[in-house]
């Protein structure tokens, strides 16, 4: 049994076709797509057993098989996986003398599998020694492997590290700051696990397609300076200058891959680069008073007891959305978010379960979107 769907809606030249037996990993796959599109190292954080490495390997297979010609040899040669602990030596990163060439050709050279790999996975990086971490920095930042006089270019297209947690005493360490893309991989809920059993358990397969925007496609997204100023108000004291230089490009890529408005992309970027609290603070700053008022009315739908009360409230919200969209106060991304919130509330509302008509909302939002300014 399998399910095929597209994670991203926008058209891109590059597409990854992912097949996985994992469930509820769409956000992780999007993060890996973001890492590939931006060329930034990604850190996956989560408890043992949440399938951090398996998710990366499923994505790696999709990347290696993008032309449909992947072989077992490709998988073995183009992926470098390092399991680190306190005893792992820096030579695992820096490379070791190639004894074969030394004895057969009397030639000294380094065997550097990490430099040759197209996908690099460093597991349990929180347990790595300072020597390992220092050796990683050049590979991560400059894409060069430094070993004495040797400076070897690295070929990686996707660099992912995993850890159980970032040690509290190291949260402000420059090493962790190098991972601008951070994502927490959570456990699957008990309810979702039951659904997984009903779908066939370990025999179940999900298939995704996810678009990978190139530089030109990313730059199609326009982020007004006024919105970046709001980001700076929240993020400046939490980020290094180096990290802040990536905010515009990263936010554009987020907008593209998640197919969300610029405001939502900036909020998600803050969540990725800083934390959830920063994202919530930025969301509050980016919302105009008018949009906040509409969102508040949407949340109030929970409190109504009868279908008649809901109908009146919906009509009021629809009127406000039309007015604000016409005046350019609300963009299509915000309208879409309101639509999704309303549909979710109405589909689960006791007074509306037997009466909900999603078509009326979809028709309204479609009409409004055609008349509202394009946020991109």
Task: Give the positions of each predicted feature.
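Conserved alpha-helical scaffold flanking the Walker A/P-loop in AAA+ ATPase domains
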Residues: 30-35, 99-120
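Conserved RecA-like P-loop NTPase ATPase core
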Residues: 24, 32, 44, 93, ...
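Walker A/P-loop
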Residues: 33-85
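Basic, amphipathic alpha-helical bundle interface domains used for macromolecular binding and assembly
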Residues: 189, 200-288
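Pre-Walker A (pre-P-loop) alpha-helix and adjacent loop at the N terminus of AAA/AAA+ ATPase modules
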Residues: 4-48
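Canonical AAA+ ATPase core
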Residues: 63-69, 100-104, 119-132, 138-213
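C-terminal engagement/docking regions of AAA+ P-loop ATPases
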Residues: 48-54, 257-376
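Conserved NTP-binding/hydrolysis module of P-loop NTPases
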Residues: 80-104
């Amino acid at each position: 049994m399998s399910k095929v769907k597209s994670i991203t809606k926008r058209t891109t030249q590059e597409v990854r076709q992912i097949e996985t037996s994992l469930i509820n990993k769409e956000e992780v796959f999007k993060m890996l797509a973001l890492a590939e599109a931006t060329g930034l190292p990604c850190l996956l954080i989560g408890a043992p057993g949440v399938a951090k490495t398996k998710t990366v390997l499923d994505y790696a297979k999709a990347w290696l098989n993008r032309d449909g010609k992947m072989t077992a040899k490709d998988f073995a040669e183009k992926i470098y996986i390092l399991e680190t602990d306190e005893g792992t030596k820096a030579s695992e990163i820096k490379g070791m003398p190639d004894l074969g060439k030394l004895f057969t050709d009397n030639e000294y050279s380094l065997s550097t599998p990490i430099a040759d790999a197209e996908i690099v996975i460093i597991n349990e990086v929180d347990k790595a020694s300072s020597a390992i971490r220092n050796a990683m920095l050049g590979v991560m930042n400059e894409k060069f492997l430094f070993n004495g006089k040797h400076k070897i270019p690295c070929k990686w297209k996707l660099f992912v590290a995993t850890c159980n947690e970032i040690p509290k005493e190291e949260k402000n360490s420059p090493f962790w700051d190098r991972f601008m893309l951070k994502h927490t991989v959570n456990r699957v809920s008990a309810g979702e696990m039951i659904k997984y059993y009903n779908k066939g358990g370990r025999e179940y397969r999900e298939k995704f397609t996810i678009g990978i925007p190139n530089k030109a496609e990313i730059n199609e997204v326009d982020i007004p300076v006024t919105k970046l100023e709001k980001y700076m108000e929240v993020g400046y004291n939490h980020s290094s200058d180096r990290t802040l230089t990536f905010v515009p490009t990263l936010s554009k890529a987020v907008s593209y891959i998640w197919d969300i408005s610029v405001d939502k992309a900036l909020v998600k970027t803050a969540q990725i680069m800083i934390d959830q609290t920063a994202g919530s603070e930025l969301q509050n700053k980016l919302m105009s008073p008018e949009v906040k008022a509409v969102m508040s009315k949407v949340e109030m739908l929970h409190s109504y007891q009868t279908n008649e009360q809901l109908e009146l409230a919906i009509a009021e919200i629809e009127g406000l959305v039309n007015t604000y969209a016409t005046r350019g106060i609300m963009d299509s991304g915000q309208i879409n978010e309101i639509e999704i919130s309303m549909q979710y509330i109405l589909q689960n509302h006791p007074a509306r379960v037997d009466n909900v008509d999603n078509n009326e909302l979809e028709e309204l939002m479609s009409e409004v979107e055609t008349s509202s300014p394009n946020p991109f």
